[in-house]
Amino acid sequence: MEEAELVKERLQAITDKRKIQEEISQKRLKIEEEKLRHQHLKKKALREKWLLDGIGSRKEQEEMKKQNQQDQHQIQVLEQSILRLEKEIQDLEKAELQISTNEEAILKKLKSVERTTEDIIRSVKVEKEETSGASIEDIYANIPDLPKSYVPSRLRKERNEGIEDDEQNRKALYAMEIKVEKDLKTGESTVLSSIPLPSDDFKGTGIKVYDDGQKSVYAVSSNHSAAYNGTDGLAPVEVEDLLRQASERNSKSPTEYHDPVYANPFCRPTTPQREKATPGPNFQERIKMKARGLGKDMNGSIHTMNNGLSEERGSSVNHISPIRPIPHPRSMTQQAEERPHSPQKRQMTPWEESDVTQDKCAPSAKSQLSPGEAPVGKSERQGSSPTCQEDEEDVRYNIVHSLPSDVEDTEPVTMIFMGYQRADDSEEEKKLLTGYDGIIRAELVVIDDEEEEGEGEAEKPSYHPIAPHSQVFQPAKPTPLPRKRAEVNPHENTNHKSPHKNSISLKEQEESLGSPIHQSPLDIQIAGDGTEDPSLTALRMRMAKLGKKVI
């Protein structure tokens, strides 16, 4: 009762205080209005006094004096009202201060008498314990057809309150250990691993950072000991995020699957594959005829000139690119496969072979290959007469590697490019050179050992005896094809070489070249001049500087 009275007194004091504050605010507004009127009347009185000095009539002066007296009276009344209002405001402020002091005293008494929330909760619990549950049971007893074993939920809750409050008796249904790494800069938490634990082995060690009645989260350090006491609690959003990351990590499959791979050869993709160097049906026969006369050495370099066109091998397609015939350096050592050659054709000289091929099938101008055509695979398209097809394709020549039989085939052969030699632009030569892609001719230079150098100086001169008239150094007549030479083919570049043993000797070559049948107009012209070839002169000078002799 005392507490209620104190509360009423406090509320009354607050109400009175509020009324006084409103009165004070109204009186202050009224004072402001009175002050404005007082100022206005003062200005009016001064103006009338100034006008009174300029009036000459007596009647008007009397009227002005009466008006001035009235204004002065109003000014005095306003001044008195202003003073009175100010005094009232002071009294109200004193009353407000008195009410405030009384309110503070009532509040102190109320705090001493008023119970705290804990006291109220405690008293409620005591009242519940004192009151018996007979009243609730009486209420449910009046309900018909109610089983005797039925216990109201309120009673069950009250009976189980003590057990629920005891956290040690609460058993965990599921436990999981989650290793979390927290970035101190961004504050983001990343789940490193999650390991489920049996609920029986779980021990609530650590500091509890979250508990909503269904889930409990404990902070444990890396060494499975309790974390430091300064661990902050987790918000429900953070707990849900960690559980989501852990569930996503567990749901990920450890194996990564890819598209099915089929080994069926019919399901092979249509992308271009790298072709293997396997000859076709007529490919090996063509190699037998064209590869004769080439060096067997593994380091020999081959360069084909076809009217300034050279075939180079790409990834899987043959590319034809126009380039100038320039000397290539010695190629890298590669493993080469020896191709079997027919012994009957090996015994034939290149001139006999060319005569035989011309008699069988004379190539026409239309059948010859143009510079832009590729010779690969033409024998497969025309398989009826392979000899004629090979003659048509054999317009392009390779380097002449005709070595004498006494030269060992194990030694490498090196060719030195000494320059070009131009032919006169005559009509007959243009006709003869139709389809002519260019043939490289080289001088055979044998460099002896130093021991044999002294013996050979007395017998052999230091220059070639028939250099101006030698057919080895002059361009041969292109009409009678001397012999089929191996092309630079993507499949023949490094793997097809013919032995030197099948090549004709130098003496036989000079005799065959010296015959009038194979002399070209260029040979006759140079022989008539009696001048030496500039390439031979340069070669002789170079050999003389090296101390070697030229055969």
Curated annotation (Swiss-Prot):
Modified residues (N-acetylmethionine): 1
Cross-link named Glycyl lysine isopeptide (Lys-Gly) (interchain with G-Cter in SUMO1), sites: 179
GO cellular component: a single term: membrane
UniProt xrefs under InterPro entries: Paralemmin
Disulfide bonds: none
The protein's assembly and partners: Interacts with GLUL. Cell projection, dendrite. Cell projection, dendritic spine.
Localisation per UniProt entry: Cytoplasm; Cell projection, Dendrite; Cell projection, Dendritic spine
Cross-link (Glycyl lysine isopeptide (Lys-Gly) (interchain with G-Cter in SUMO2)): 125, 179
Record's comment on post-translational modification: Phosphorylated.
Residues bearing the modification Phosphoserine: 135, 321, 370, 384-385, 498, 515, 520
Basic and acidic residues composition bias: residue spans: 247-259, 484-495
Keywords: Acetylation, Cell projection, Coiled coil, Cytoplasm, Isopeptide bond, Phosphoprotein, Synapse, Ubl conjugation
Modified residues (Phosphothreonine): 271
Region: Disordered, residue numbers: 247-393, 450-529
TM regions (residue ranges): none
Protein name, as recorded: Palmdelphin
BP-aspect Gene Ontology terms: regulation of cell shape
Species annotation: Sus scrofa (Pig)
Entry's family note: Belongs to the paralemmin family.
Stretches assigned to coiled coil: 2-106
Keyword Methyltransferase recorded: no
UniProt KW Coiled coil keyword: yes
